[in-house]
């Protein structure tokens, strides 16, 4: 080895060059950003009441969090959003930021392939074009990865997604239907406090989600396809009976004739169902979300429903009934949370689960044993 280069190691060659940091500076900035993403309660409330979408989104994220401190703060925010500036509980139809404007919550369901995304965008653009502020939410307890199809639908609702009077939010989270429903309902409260006077709640997936959405909205709309029976569409009679309007989508081109025939059939069918306690007979109509044909009429149907229900007091009574249901659900959730997080119960549960699994104890005996000393 050349004596002149004898002591030139890799380190000595790099002499004078500042060594790289041991910690990724960008990672630190991201960590600090995440820590600071949660605001104080007054900051959340100020942003929500001003209609700040960024803060509204952060507040919804706070609601979705499972951390106990986040949940406590979320409840503070929700309580304030449900009050008037005087501190009184809100009348059923008055939004905090709406200054007395009547709002309406609309549930929208339909089988896959019915054109729900296109329909929501078409009706949504019509609603915002009339000067309303629209929030689009979803209820989907089924997906742990995609968080509901509305995430994909949002990219298909390009025009509505960039509408300054529209706010699109994916499903609260995957998990139990009750948990998702609670978070969706709380998201509705925040959106209304932020000035969104029209809220669409979309059901994603199948099963009991339609019933849950019905329990949190004022008007329930069922999208149908022409040329397919109920069995092929996977629609149960109970879901049809829940609907305030049955809209046959894709009524255009070669499909228009079949859509008209289907409309006549469904019109006959709804008259055979037991009458609603409100006296409202579900309206059957056609539309083409693709061409926007019939979309304005659907909004007129919704307004006619709201006017009729308000005149007879059904609208208010429905909201009050929903509040009572929320109250009982909240009790059940609180009791379950306190029960399952109790240290003594958690330990005993694990022991009893082993005995039930092994067959040395049947489930009913295990339950009796769990509550024997309580």
Where are these regions (language model features)?
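Short hinge/gating elements
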Residues: 41-45, 109, 171, 247-252, ...
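Glycine-biased, low-complexity coil/linker segments
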Residues: 94-99
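Long, well-ordered amphipathic alpha-helical subdomains in the mid-to-C-terminal portions
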Residues: 56, 286, 297-374
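Long, basic/Gly/Ser/Thr-rich N-terminal segments
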Residues: 1-58
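Canonical P-loop GTPase G-domain recognition
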Residues: 245, 251-309
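Nucleotide-state-sensitive switch-loop elements of NTP-binding domains
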Residues: 40-51, 56-89, 100-106, 111-114, ...
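Short, structured coil segments at secondary-structure junctions
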Residues: 216-217, 241-242, 280
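Flexible active-site lid/hinge loop adjacent to a nucleotide/diphosphate
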Residues: 226-257
